[in-house]
Amino acid sequence: MATYKVTLVNAAEGLNTTIDVADDTYILDAAEEQGIDLPYSCRAGACSTCAGKVVSGTVDQSDQSFLDDDQIAAGFVLTCVAYPTSDVTIETHKEEDLY
C-alpha cells in the first residue's frame, strides 16, 4: 500500500495543510480523520458539494458519476470518491467554479 502527500489549499478558508493519504483511502475521509473540515453532502460521487481542483499530481476518481469529461479534463475532482495516485495538491471548496 502506497501513501501519498495530499496538500489541501484554499486561501479564503485559510487552509494550507498537507496530510498523508493511503492509496486506498478517499481524500475526504482522510481529511476528516485529520480534523480538516471540508464540504460534502452525498459522499457517493453523485453531487458537486465536495468538488476541488487538482493543481498538481493525480487522483483516481473512477467511482464518481457527476463530473463530465470537460470538468475532469479541467482538473475538477470529487474529494469524497478520489484516491491519490501520486503526491497531489488540491484547491478545495470549488463547487461554485463548476458552473
UniProtKB/Swiss-Prot annotation:
- What PANTHER family does its record include? FERREDOXIN, FERREDOXIN-2, CHLOROPLASTIC
Occurrences of domain 2Fe-2S ferredoxin-type (ranges): 4-96
Q: Which CDD domains match?
A: fer2
Gene3D superfamilies xref list: 3.10.20.30
Name the family the entry cites.
Belongs to the 2Fe2S plant-type ferredoxin family.
Provide the cofactor list for this protein: [2Fe-2S] cluster
Segments crossing the lipid bilayer? none
Q: What is the protein's given name?
A: Ferredoxin-1
An example Gene Ontology biological process: electron transport chain
Question: Its quaternary structure?
Answer: Forms a complex with heterodimeric ferredoxin-thioredoxin reductase (FTR) and thioredoxin.
